[in-house]
């Protein structure tokens, strides 16, 4: 069901400060011990598809998304944050509603005297 296009409309699903223990990094010590990694994810979805509680294909389920990310980081060691982000993009874009994704991935506790270091990524459908 499409909403009437009287307004410019935007819908964003977000996950804020999800912290998971992840095998990530190029250094030998990073390959032996999981690190705390913080994820902040924003997903812009098609705002003109009306959410329907009887048809969950009309929404992006954030609980499902979190579970997929948890599974992704459990499966392997990531040498680079960039590789992890690309795999996250691939999973999130499987949902037909997704138009744009912003991901911020931060390694916590890795650099002395720093709360975190990381990278922000943005990808959108053309």
Where are these regions (language model features)?
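N-terminal, polar/charged subdomain of small-to-medium soluble alpha/beta proteins
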Residues: 1-126
